[in-house]
Amino acid sequence: MVRPVAWPRPIPEGHSWRALVGDGWPAHVRVLHPASRRIDGVEHPVRWREIAPEGVSIATAGWSEVSGIGLHEGVTGPGWDHEPDVGPSPLILPVLLRQMLPGVPEGRVWIGEWDGWGGRKRPAGSRPLTVPGRRYHVAATSPRKLLTGLNPDRLPDVVWDEAGTFIIVADIDLPSTVVGCQKGIAERLLRCPGLEAVRVDGAAPVVT
């Protein structure tokens, strides 16, 4: 029998950001996935703050509040042609990992792949992990191997380090990536020019 790995923090009930990443993280960061605009056949990223109406806080707003159009409604809007990606974003996750992994103490990093992706074999050496609403195949790797071996067509849905300094959750239903982490890591993410990152209250309800 394959022994399951454990989520790094207890998962509380409810539909809060804390319920996604687990309880007890000192800081919670929401990294917004960009929309895009096509100019001369080339896709250019569009940040939420570029199109958000005056008075709308991108820290607490969902995509529909920012754009005026519901997620997955299949239409364009003023200033953008394609809505943000959901799940692991090839524009976001590599940047996040480059910000976080170099400071990780020696030890393993756990990566999890949602079991709902079609047409995929289970990752080699993975073990099952079930949390409320999701089931993952989780495998251990090193920070170096994860950084050098990223495949934009098959990014992990969850990543956390054995030392317990962070967890990254790129849920398939969300146009943002959620991070539970130490305060120093949160500050680094909020300052990163390659990310549109906002601090969120872990007890606040999840918005899409």
List the predicted regions and their residue ranges.
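Amphipathic protein-protein interaction modules
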Residues: L129-I185
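N-terminal low-complexity, intrinsically disordered segments
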Residues: I58-L71, V75, R154-I168, A204-T208
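Alpha-helical oligomerization segments
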Residues: A170-T208
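Acidic-enriched, low-complexity/disordered segments with a strong bias for Aspartate over Glutamate
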Residues: D23, D40, D81, D85, ...
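Aromatic-enriched hydrophobic runs in primary sequence
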Residues: W114-W117, F166, K183, L189
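Extended, low-hydrophobicity segments enriched in charged/polar residues
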Residues: M1-T148
